[in-house]
């Protein structure tokens, strides 16, 4: 592995339809095998289905869903005196978004609807209503952090 400097972070361009960087990141998360066009079609169809079902702006529903999914705390393993402790730490903003998108897409893929378009739309709507597997994942993460609160003094 190279010992040179860390590669610079590449700027994510906003998507053409909603002019939003987080939508571009969602498209990149949904994308499989480099098929960005297919991923964009899935996301845009899901957004149109959300607008149809709720009557609200799809981007607002998506942002509400992301606020409900993104974790504030998580646990990290820390080795102290020969034993591992799960230490609760705050999540940095960039990682919050990344985890939220990851959990949203994974929960969508695990759903039972017929197409990915429908799965994604339903999961986003569920997350906006504080239900669904992605919100449960966040709650589980927060519960773990709360349960290990006694080890918070090991934070680094």
Curated annotation (Swiss-Prot):
Gene Ontology MF annotations: rRNA binding; structural constituent of ribosome; tRNA binding
CDD domains xrefs: uS7_Bacteria (cd14869)
Keywords: Ribonucleoprotein, Ribosomal protein, RNA-binding, rRNA-binding, tRNA-binding
Keyword RNA-binding: yes
Database matches in PROSITE patterns: RIBOSOMAL_S7 (PS00052)
Coiled coil ranges: none
Disulfide bonds: none
GO CC aspect terms: small ribosomal subunit
Single GO BP term: translation
Subunit structure: Part of the 30S ribosomal subunit. Contacts proteins S9 and S11.
Membership in a protein family: Belongs to the universal ribosomal protein uS7 family.
NCBIfam families: rpsG_bact
Record function comment: One of the primary rRNA binding proteins, it binds directly to 16S rRNA where it nucleates assembly of the head domain of the 30S subunit. Is located at the subunit interface close to the decoding center, probably blocks exit of the E-site tRNA.
Name this polypeptide is given: Small ribosomal subunit protein uS7
Organism: Streptococcus pyogenes serotype M12 (strain MGAS2096)
Gene, per the UniProt record: rpsG
């Amino acid at each position: 592995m190279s010992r040179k400097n860390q590669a610079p972070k590449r700027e994510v361009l906003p998507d053409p339809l909603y002019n939003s960087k987080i939508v571009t990141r969602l498209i990149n998360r949904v994308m499989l095998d480099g098929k960005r066009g297919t991923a964009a079609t899935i996301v845009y169809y899901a957004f149109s289905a959300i607008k149809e079902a709720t009557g609200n702006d799809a981007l607002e529903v998506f942002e509400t869903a992301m606020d409900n999914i993104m974790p504030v705390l998580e646990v990290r393993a820390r080795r102290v005196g020969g034993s591992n402790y799960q230490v609760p730490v705050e999540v940095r903003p960039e990682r919050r978004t990344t985890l939220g998108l990851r959990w949203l897409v994974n929960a969508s893929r695990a759903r039972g609807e017929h197409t990915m378009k429908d799965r994604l739309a339903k999961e986003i709507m569920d997350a906006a209503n504080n239900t669904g597997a992605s919100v449960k994942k966040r709650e589980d993460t927060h519960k773990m952090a709360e349960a290990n609160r006694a080890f918070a003094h090991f934070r680094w």
